[in-house]
């Protein structure tokens, strides 16, 4: 144990240097240049050598090998400390160091990716803003950070992503959809744990009141100090140790660090207030009296849990079943950033799959068992390994994924995300380590996408066990359970209190109900203990809802009897896939954004047709009136077929109009040209956005072709196999005018 201890407290960078071979130490360009605490969601500043696309797989692995070793050694240390039942403070420090080393490894992996694999974010964001996909809310008043308005194109894309979600999950799985209020009384969120645990530490500029998240500000300040050439090796090592443990500091420890490192406001240079705990929920009061505090909901899940009994009744009392809700949630982020990735109001789509804890098998798992996807298990993370592509069925068989219900939803999530435009090669499922788990979860896998910000969580798939239902049942005294028929009846011994309602009512008046409710939910062990006190002392004391009551023999006795059971009560476990639709949208933007080869100014989004904001455009080649009947005919037919489309009859060249529609991701384009007008049967061209190839078909056929393409019933390859490629017009403007 003593030989392991120095690694625990030494600066992480120094520890890593000790693990590097001399050959790499002689090549400083290959060493890590970013601070250890660089988060996986922070923009990566690539080292010169590592950013070259010429670094091959073997060369990259040579750089990564010592970092993997450092993570593996720290993971071994964490395991040993836990096995030896070391003090919790030592375990926490070791875990913090492990997380820091993981971040270093991941940052380096991202830095070594090919240069052409990184989207030009500035160019993409310019396109999004210029074409009004979305923009900052209240912009003409200066805007409010963390709040966004979606324009026509962004709104259509978002609605299509939601509609695809409904079809993929709610319709396919026959999930029960509900729509609950966004206002939530305080007791509900007190019970769920959000009031006590949903908080961050915050500091304020003492002069202008501007707020900053304390850990983020301290991290940025220390990174700035460490980048100074005058900063000594000892000082850097000290600051790296601070950064490695940043997640574990309490309020007073953070306050001391702000003083020690003289942290000021990064905007004004003013002094900062001491850190205070800041709850991330938006607080309000329900009703004019101000007597009922409440919050805007931080998640949609609680509404489903509170309606569990009604949903169970709707499902004829049977398990398993699932309920879902799509709606807005709110988190009062201290310093929102990174566009749609961290906002204060966001749309969520959540599923709560209620299942018997003894029967966590999904009958449809074989439908997804053969999928191959990248899995990043907790074991791989602490061993310094990368995500590994695995067959989903093998992952469940080998115990990487706990059960087929969780495995089934991971597979369905993968299929949905790739359907809406997320690249399978930039998508992984990462298992939470034990110290990362939310207060309500016993296992959790996040779908993470690789973006220019690094790996970001876009979907969480948590096994919430029976946490929420049990908490709400205890708080409300309402049993949130399902009844499970027994294969054979069984006889059980029952022990319960038998209260004397008259005596209790006389003694405690209006509080008698509290006493009766408490006695009704006591378990056998507690009742037996209180019975002994009754026999010995003639009384015992109970405490409920902050009040104490003394009960005597004339108020209560204990009843024992046998009971034959035909059903047993089960508190269901809950598997919860939770989708952040804003983050999914942002990932789709990055993964589908392209620049036309040979023309840096022509950008386009290759949205899959199923979610494209417009399925096709209708483009008359000329403004001649003879073209207008065909425009009208096509537009009306497309509408009848349920195909969203955009008519562009402006005077610009056809190439420029193609570029405009490509820029907003219109999947296909119908062009009415001179052959359409001059020849019978009347035909028009259909253009594919991504390949820019065109076919020619009769005008009457085109709406159904576009509909089938948009619904995924056929592919562009199918269309090209059935219809002739368009090579060029056979007639021109002159013939049209003469006619």
From Swiss-Prot:
InterPro entries per the UniProt record, alphabetical: aa-tRNA-synt_IIb (IPR002314), aa-tRNA-synth_II (IPR006195), aa-tRNA-synth_II/BPL/LPL (IPR045864), Anticodon-bd (IPR004154), Anticodon-bd_dom_sf (IPR036621), Gly-tRNA_synthase/POLG2 (IPR027031), GlyRS-like_core (IPR033731), tRNA-synt_gly (IPR002315)
Localization annotation: Cytoplasm; Mitochondrion; Cell projection, Axon; Secreted
GO biological process: diadenosine tetraphosphate biosynthetic process; mitochondrial glycyl-tRNA aminoacylation; tRNA aminoacylation for protein translation
Keywords: Acetylation, Aminoacyl-tRNA synthetase, ATP-binding, Cell projection, Cytoplasm, Hydrolase, Ligase, Mitochondrion, Nucleotide-binding, Phosphoprotein, Protein biosynthesis, Secreted, Transferase, Transit peptide
First and last residues of the transit peptide: 1-36
Top-rank taxon, per record: Eukaryota
Main localization, broad class: cytoplasm
Residues engaged in binding ATP: 331-333, 342-343, 457-458, 583
Modified residues (N6-acetyllysine): 204, 501
EC number from the UniProt entry: 6.1.1.14, 2.7.7.-
GO terms under cellular component: axon; extracellular exosome; mitochondrion
Functional note: Catalyzes the ATP-dependent ligation of glycine to the 3'-end of its cognate tRNA, via the formation of an aminoacyl-adenylate intermediate (Gly-AMP). Also produces diadenosine tetraphosphate (Ap4A), a universal pleiotropic signaling molecule needed for cell regulation pathways, by direct condensation of 2 ATPs. Thereby, may play a special role in Ap4A homeostasis.
Protein name: Glycine--tRNA ligase
Lineage: Eukaryota, Metazoa, Chordata, Craniata, Vertebrata
GN (gene name): GARS1
């Amino acid at each position: 144990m003593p030989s392991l201890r120095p690694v625990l407290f030494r600066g992480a960078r120094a520890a890593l240097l000790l693990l590097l071979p001399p050959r790499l130490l002689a090549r400083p360009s290959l060493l890590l240049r970013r601070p250890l605490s660089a988060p996986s969601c922070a923009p990566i500043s690539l080292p010169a050598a590592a950013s070259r696309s010429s670094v091959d797989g073997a060369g990259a692995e040579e750089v990564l090998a010592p970092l993997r070793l450092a993570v593996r050694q720290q993971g071994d240390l964490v395991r040993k400390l836990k096995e030896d039942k070391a003090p919790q403070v030592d375990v926490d420090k070791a875990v913090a160091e492990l997380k820091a080393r993981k971040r270093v490894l991941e940052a380096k992996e991202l830095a070594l990716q090919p240069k052409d694999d990184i989207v030009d974010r500035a160019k993409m964001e310019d396109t999004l803003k210029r074409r009004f996909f979305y923009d900052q809310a209240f912009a003409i008043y200066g805007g409010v950070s963390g709040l966004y308005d979606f324009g026509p194109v962004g709104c259509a894309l978002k609605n299509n992503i939601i509609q695809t979600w409904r079809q993929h999950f709610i319709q396919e799985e026959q999930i029960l959809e509900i729509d609950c209020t966004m206002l939530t009384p305080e007791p509900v969120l007190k019970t769920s744990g959000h009031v006590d645990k949903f908080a961050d530490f915050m500091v304020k500029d003492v002069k202008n009141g501007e707020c900053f998240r304390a850990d983020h500000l301290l991290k940025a300040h220390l990174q700035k100090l460490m980048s100074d050439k005058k900063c000594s090796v000892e000082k850097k090592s000290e600051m790296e140790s601070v950064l490695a443990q940043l997640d574990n500091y309490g309020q007073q420890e953070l306050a001391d660090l702000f003083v020690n490192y003289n942290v000021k406001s990064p905007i004004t240079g003013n002094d900062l207030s001491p850190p205070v705990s800041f709850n991330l929920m938006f607080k309000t009061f329900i009703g004019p009296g101000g007597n009922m505090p409440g919050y805007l909901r931080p998640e949609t899940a609680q509404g489903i849990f509170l309606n569990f009994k009604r949903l169970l009744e709707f499902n004829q009392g049977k398990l398993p079943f699932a309920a879902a809700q799509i709606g807005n949630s709110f988190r009062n982020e201290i310093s929102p950033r990174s566009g749609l990735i961290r906002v204060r109001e966001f749309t969520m789509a959540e599923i709560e799959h209620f299942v018997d804890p003894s029967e966590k098998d999904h009958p449809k798992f074989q439908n997804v068992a053969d999928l191959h996807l990248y899995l990043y298990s907790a074991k791989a993370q602490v061993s310094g390994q990368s995500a590994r592509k695995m067959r989903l069925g093998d992952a469940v068989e080998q115990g990487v994924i706990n059960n087929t219900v969780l495995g089934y939803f991971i597979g369905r999530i993968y299929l949905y995300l790739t359907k809406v435009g997320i690249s399978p090669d930039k998508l992984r499922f990462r298992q939470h380590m034990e110290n990362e788990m939310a207060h309500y979860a016993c296992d959790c896998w996040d779908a993470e996408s690789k973006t220019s910000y690094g790996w970001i969580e876009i979907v969480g798939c948590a096994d919430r066990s029976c946490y929420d239902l049990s908490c709400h049942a205890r708080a409300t005294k309402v049993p949130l359970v399902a009844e499970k028929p027994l294969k054979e009846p069984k006889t059980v011994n029952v022990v319960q209190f038998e209260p004397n309602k008259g005596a209790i009512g006389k003694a405690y008046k209006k509080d008698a109900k509290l006493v009766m409710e408490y006695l009704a939910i006591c378990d056998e062990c507690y009742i037996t203990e209180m019975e002994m006190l009754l026999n010995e002392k003639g009384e015992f004391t109970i405490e409920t809802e902050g009040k104490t009551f003394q009960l005597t023999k004339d108020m209560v006795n204990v009843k024992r009897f046998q009971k034959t059971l035909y059903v047993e009560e089960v508190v269901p476990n809950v598997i919860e896939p939770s989708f952040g639709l804003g983050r999914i949208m942002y990932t789709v933007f990055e993964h589908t954004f392209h620049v036309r080869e040979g023309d840096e100014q022509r950008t386009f989004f290759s949205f899959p047709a199923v979610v494209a904001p417009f399925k096709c455009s209708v483009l008359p080649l000329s403004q001649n009136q003879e073209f207008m009947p065909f425009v009208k005919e096509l537009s009306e037919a497309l509408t009848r077929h349920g195909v969203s489309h955009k008519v562009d009859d402006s005077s610009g060249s056809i190439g420029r109009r193609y570029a405009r529609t490509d820029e907003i991701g219109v999947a296909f384009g119908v062009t009415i040209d001179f052959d359409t007008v001059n020849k019978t049967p009347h035909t028009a061209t259909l253009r594919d956005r991504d390949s820019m190839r065109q076919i020619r078909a009769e005008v009457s056929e085109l709406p159904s072709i576009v509909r089938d393409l948009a619904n995924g019933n056929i592919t562009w390859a199918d269309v090209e196999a059935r219809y002739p490629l368009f090579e060029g017009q056979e007639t021109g403007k002159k013939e049209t005018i003469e006619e």
